[in-house]
């Protein structure tokens, strides 16, 4: 990595980062469904990691992750005045619901609502945040509740 002053992407480090991200943002069920055999799993991993390495800059990745290192919204949650939905899925490994953080903190937001989407074949761990077919109805509900005069 050379302190970020590299001339070639540090493939070994990026491959390790890909592995961690893959495990943290997916779900075992979906991974098994996509690649039910060891051979399919290895092919999928090789393809995914090589694609990741080709399109990811190590410095950008470090910057993005470091930017959230000390992020803590809790002290200002009570200042949120609008209708607010916090949506999570039961299989989220990055924000595991069993820690109870959203259960506790949503109470600080006057118009806050915590929605925990149960595990299903449609959820995919933390990656569920990119699947509006799972949470789109809640977005529609929030938009309607946010209309003037509602």
PLM feature spans:
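Short, conserved loop/helix-junction motifs that constitute active-site signature segments
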Residues: 77-81, 106-110
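Conserved alpha/beta-hydrolase "acid-adjacent" motif
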Residues: 72, 93-101
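Short beta-strand/loop motif that positions the catalytic acidic residue
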Residues: 80, 86-88
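Catalytic active-site module of serine/aspartate enzymes centered on a nucleophile-bearing elbow/loop
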Residues: 109-150
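Acidic beta-to-alpha connecting loop that harbors the catalytic carboxylate
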Residues: 90-92, 119-120
């Amino acid at each position: 990595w050379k302190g970020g002053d590299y001339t070639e992407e540090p493939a070994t480090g990026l491959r390790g980062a890909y592995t961690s991200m893959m495990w943290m943002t997916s779900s075992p069920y979906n991974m098994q469904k996509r690649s039910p055999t060891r051979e399919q799993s290895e092919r999928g991993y090789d393809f995914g990691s090589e694609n990741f390495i080709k399109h990811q800059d190590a410095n950008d990745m470090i910057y993005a992750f470091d930017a959230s290192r000390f992020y803590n919204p809790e002290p200002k949650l009570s200042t949120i005045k609008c209708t607010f939905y916090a949506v999570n899925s039961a299989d989220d490994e990055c924000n595991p619901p069993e820690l109870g953080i959203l259960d506790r903190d949503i109470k600080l937001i006057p118009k806050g609502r915590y929605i925990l989407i149960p595990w299903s074949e449609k959820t995919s761990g933390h990656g569920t945040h990119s699947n509006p077919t799972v949470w789109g109805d809640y977005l529609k509900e929030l938009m309607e509740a946010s209309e003037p005069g509602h």
